[in-house]
Amino acid sequence: DMGFQQVHFTRPDVSHYQAQHWSQIEAGYHADMDWLERNTDVRYHPESLHPGTQTVILVRLDYLMDRDAAVIASDRGDIAQYAVGRDYHKVMRRRLTQLGHEIQALLDPIGFRAFVDSAPVLERQLAEQSGMGWIGKNTLLLNDEAGSWFFLGEIYTSVPLPTDSSAQSNRCNNCRACLKVCPTDAFPEP
């Protein structure tokens, strides 16, 4: 048990997200995150990050286990819930690498590469494509069980594994809760 709450499999092709992603960049929605403008060829063609990639294994690791504990007094500074505790990059990379080695032990030597916010990966789009959740009006991946309180990690592998069902339907519908509570009013109208 690696501690992941969900594991999904999908193909590496995310080219159908290219136009939408680039239009958000051109509109300036990425603010000062200039790295989102770079390496677009790799972003839209995941197999170029790990040649021979046939399957992307996506994992979800929840970081908010006690929702009641997340309530913070308004007279104190706030710390993002994901920043409390150990560095998730290290935790997830270790677990993903272990998972990759376990798969490798079962399926002859395979090539794999693990990612946790470490490369130009369209992880939300890959996760949406796999059926793990849907991208909400707040641009986060939303999941029925965890909301948006989770980390994503990926393993690119050369093994053609069976993939999960297609993307979930967007369940936001007419809901605007995330837009209403955003303290900076950062999101344009959908």
What are these regions (language model features)?
Residues 4-6, 177-190:
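Iron-sulfur cluster-binding cysteine motifs and their immediate structural context
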